[in-house]
UniProtKB/Swiss-Prot annotation:
Residues bound to substrate: 151-158, 295-299
Organism: Penicillium oxalicum (strain 114-2 / CGMCC 5302) (Penicillium decumbens)
EC number(s) on file: 1.-.-.-
MF (Gene Ontology): nucleotide binding; oxidoreductase activity, acting on NAD(P)H
Designated name of the protein: Trans-enoyl reductase poxP
Main function: Trans-enoyl reductase; part of the gene cluster that mediates the biosynthesis of oxaleimides, cytotoxic compounds containing an unusual disubstituted succinimide moiety. The first step of the pathway is provided by the HR-PKS poxF that serves in a new mode of collaborative biosynthesis with the PKS-NRPS poxE, by providing the olefin containing amino acid substrate via the synthesis of an ACP-bound dec-4-enoate.
Keyword Cell membrane: no
Disulfide bond positions: none
InterPro entries noted in UniProt: ADH-like_N (IPR013154), GroES-like_sf (IPR011032), NAD(P)-bd_dom_sf (IPR036291), PKS_ER (IPR020843), Trans-enoyl_RdTase-like (IPR047122)
Length: 378
């Protein structure tokens, strides 16, 4: 029996191509294991969304950590993607007048979502928030677009500005006596993005990484790089910053990173922002204010996780995040923001499963894994 085409909700601009009713996706099975399914329905986009044909995806640590920690049978996995706009919702057309059917875009969505099972980028088609999309300039490939994605920028808006409370932005950088900001995990994709944004915002970014990634991290904007494996790492950072360090972003958030980050502060203390739940027993210094942020909250929707990762709906945060994406779009268009280095893994959906295993085993350093789901558009 032939597959019946998919129908879009009322008000959507007609799709550029005929849409099937089923697609291939990677979703969680009953135990949370990433599994390939070939008979999944297409997502039904909301009025403020666009429907995107996925060309390439990048793989993040959260793509294996979330199903492992918060299994949600049936939830589709994956956050970051690059693809082609197929249809635009009526509200999306109003808030993004620059978007056109056929545009090359990238973005991020909430994969492994227990209250929105069809949301996940490891799919042939995704429904994405229009105001959290970036248009890809011709000089950037789909692989680079998948690495840009959207989850990094959502995370960094919340981390740098909502949590750390930094005042300088790429639109209005600091002019006088810029303070240092430490990025622990500078060679990660989030790290190189943070360093570029900090530099463009007028700060003095410093970072930790493995020595073989020093050139990458310096190129991203770090004025000084420290070896996190050195026994004197924290002392070296404290000495270099002359006790002026007040803002630390810990991208790694393991026991070692937390110990080092806390020891970089002087007695005056400061703000420590991390991306995973920190160890409570470490946080005995009252002068250091800690906060664990969840980048997914930039969508403005409820984050129905647990163990401190849950968040209530926050439309105002969504609006501020959307404004930040406009800033990032300008930087990308002007060539002022450089995507993280890519490593393409072949195999389509099977390649994604391979990448998840690579990340679990710690098999990447200074690069982002990318898989193409449509090789006709490399």
């Amino acid at each position: 029996m032939p597959v019946q085409p998919c129908s879009l909700p009322a008000g959507f601009l007609p799709a550029a191509v005929s849409l099937p009713s089923q697609q291939t996706v990677i979703a969680e099975d009953e135990t949370g294991k990433a599994t390939i399914y070939h008979d999944a329905p297409l997502p039904i986009p909301e009025p403020h969304m666009v429907l995107v044909k996925t060309i390439a995806v990048s793989i993040n640590p959260c793509d294996w950590k979330m199903p492992s920690r918060f299994p949600a049978p049936g939830a589709r996995i994956g956050c970051d993607f690059a693809g082609i706009v197929l249809s635009i919702g009526p509200e999306a057309a109003r808030i993004r007048r620059d978007l056109r059917i056929g545009d090359r875009v990238c973005g991020g969505i909430h994969g492994s979502n227990p209250i929105d099972l069809p949301s996940g980028s490891f799919s042939q088609y995704v429904a994405a928030h229009a105001d959290l999309l970036l248009k890809l300039p011709n000089k950037l490939s789909f692989a680079q677009g998948a690495v840009l994605g959207g989850s990094v920028f959502a995370t960094l808006w919340i981390a740098l500005y909502e949590s750390l409370g930094l005042e300088g932005t790429p639109d209005m950088p600091l002019q006088d006596d810029p303070p240092p900001v430490l990025v622990y995990g500078g060679s990660t994709s989030t790290g190189t993005a943070a360093l570029q944004i900090l530099r463009l915002s007028g700060y003095r970014p410093i970072a930790t990484c493995s020595p073989h990634n020093n050139d990458l991290v310096r190129a991203a904007g770090a004025e000084k790089v420290f070896d996190y494996r050195s026994e004197t790492c924290a002392a070296d950072i404290k000495s270099y910053t002359n006790g002026r360090l007040r803002h630390v972003l810990d991208i790694i958030t393991d026991l070692q990173s937390q110990l080092i980050c806390y020891d970089t502060f002087s007695r005056v203390g400061g703000k420590y922002t991390c991306l995973e739940q920190p160890a409570e027993e470490l946080h005995l210094r009252r002068t250091v204010r800690k906060e664990m942020i969840v980048g997914l909250a930039a969508s403005g929707k409820e984050i129905a996780l647990a163990d401190g990762y849950e968040r209530t709906a926050n439309p105002q945060l969504r609006a501020r995040s959307g404004e930040f994406f406009q800033t990032i779009q300008r930087l990308v268009d002007e060539g002022k923001f450089v995507p993280h280095p890519t490593r393409t893994v072949e195999g389509g959906f099977e390649g994604i499963l391979k990448c998840l295993d690579i990340l679990k085993s710690g098999g990447t350093s200074g690069e982002k894994l990318v898989v193409f789901l449509d090789r006709e558009n490399p």
